[in-house]
């Protein structure tokens, strides 16, 4: 492709609203442009990268036995109502009405549509297992779109769905697609980890996220320093043991703590360690209010609270709800005096506290010498806190460290969550009606493009891995007015294309500095500069990833480039 004919508008300045490198560079290099908040156009170079990621995804999905189809973006509300998610999915689901006032959703995901499709067509175990996938635009009304393609309102996603007669069949396909995902992200050149995850609004169990390691990631990964264990911090169980001291219990005492609300403030004011304080929080668990206790140096993990109750929705109670429930402000909350009809659950660590401290449910006061079970009753002790760095790894090997990650893929064993709700059944080999067993497998295709850009860049621009680069080689005749340089550049361009390489020829009448700056910004793997030594049959070859350059004879160029790109 000749650069003079390409639509690739570059920017010299960083856009003010672009916070992270991938967003900045994809805009500056002319790979995309914003249409509205969280909505982007892919320009020609960006689209080439997107298509290459799509191709890798398709190759690995088909190798894993999945078959491609395409489902509608507009989905009838009745299907979502049938599954129960019309009401539980939340405000991220974009809803609309047609001219006849019939309700629809713009697809955030396609479980309902695929289940409806398959239940009408697959009636026997003889047609199972079946794995179908699509690459389709998705829509989510994000409250705060940010980070460019990483959190948008419209994005490209590969979603696959598998249907099975047995759990063993699901396990087999799940493992196969898990490996396919690992192959996809490895082929894209990404540094990633597959981690144990929470299924969230998707439902189901046994789920893994594929996380690209990046400091700008919105998720925290807890991983072992000596084993392969890795999990989203929300899902990492705490296996610590807590020893109760033999300190004698003291008499409960209420003390004034004016203007001291946070644990750090209270512990400093009372000269008591944070680990001896009891942090009390009120959660709304499917409309039921529950008091949750953790140690003062720990944080409540709301996903674990949700899992204790098998709840659909868990959120912090509002200040007004806390006031009505306990007649106090949030900063003065405590378990003492909570009436019997309000359930108290506590993290295991709370049980070991002796002569601790808690809020007194009265503004400006706390209790000291608090002892669980003597001063208040707990209905259940369980794992309720976030794991911390330095904790023992849940697999028993090593200690936990943290890293940030960008989620680019997620695989779920849905089980019969959707098939039972939507009456999607088949006849088994005994002629009995059974619900279809399902799996679900998603990849953020456009998000993967951003994740690659986030991992592969330097101070001068993008540095694309060869598998997804829009072109393999960038040929730059420095002076287009020079017949020797121009003709050599075109000859190299043509010969490399004949060898199967994708080549970009900078045939613009621009200054050398502009051409080189754009080349660095675009980030193609190899740059061939045709300069003053063209008359001698010599060009300069530069590797974008390393910055290494070498003068090469034209007759040796194809072999040289082949060694770089092998």
Swiss-Prot record:
Which GO cellular component terms, listed alphabetically, does the Swiss-Prot or TrEMBL entry include? Answer: cytosol
Question: What EC number(s) would the UniProt record show?
Answer: 6.1.1.15
The terms under GO molecular function for this entry are: aminoacyl-tRNA deacylase activity; ATP binding; catalytic activity, acting on a protein; proline-tRNA ligase activity; transferase activity
The protein's predominant localisation is cytoplasm
Keyword check for Ligase? yes
Q: Where in the cell is it found?
A: Cytoplasm
Q: Which Gene3D superfamilies match?
A: Anticodon-binding domain, Bira Bifunctional Protein, Domain 2
The UniProt keywords, alphabetically, are:
Aminoacyl-tRNA synthetase, ATP-binding, Cytoplasm, Ligase, Nucleotide-binding, Protein biosynthesis
Q: Which Pfam families match?
A: HGTP_anticodon, tRNA-synt_2b, tRNA_edit
Tell me the GO BP annotations in alphabetical order. prolyl-tRNA aminoacylation
Among PROSITE patterns, the record links this protein to: AA_TRNA_LIGASE_II
Q: What CDD domains does the entry give?
A: ProRS-INS, ProRS_anticodon_short, ProRS_core_prok
Which top EC class is given?
ligase
Q: Which InterPro entries match?
A: aa-tRNA-synt_IIb, aa-tRNA-synth_II, aa-tRNA-synth_II/BPL/LPL, Anticodon-bd, Anticodon-bd_dom_sf, Pro-tRNA-ligase_IIa, Pro-tRNA-synth_IIa_bac-type, Pro-tRNA-Synthase_IIa_type1
Known catalytic reactions: tRNA(Pro) + L-proline + ATP = L-prolyl-tRNA(Pro) + AMP + diphosphate
Q: How does it assemble?
A: Homodimer.
Q: What is known of its domains?
A: Consists of three domains: the N-terminal catalytic domain, the editing domain and the C-terminal anticodon-binding domain.
* Described function: Catalyzes the attachment of proline to tRNA(Pro) in a two-step reaction: proline is first activated by ATP to form Pro-AMP and then transferred to the acceptor end of tRNA(Pro). As ProRS can inadvertently accommodate and process non-cognate amino acids such as alanine and cysteine, to avoid such errors it has two additional distinct editing activities against alanine. One activity is designated as 'pretransfer' editing and involves the tRNA(Pro)-independent hydrolysis of activated Ala-AMP.
- Give the family this protein belongs to, as stated in its UniProt record: Belongs to the class-II aminoacyl-tRNA synthetase family. ProS type 1 subfamily.
**Protein name (Swiss-Prot/TrEMBL):** Proline--tRNA ligase
Source organism of this protein record: Bacillus cereus (strain AH187)
Its organism's taxonomic lineage begins at:
Bacteria, Bacillati, Bacillota, Bacilli, Bacillales
The gene designation is proS
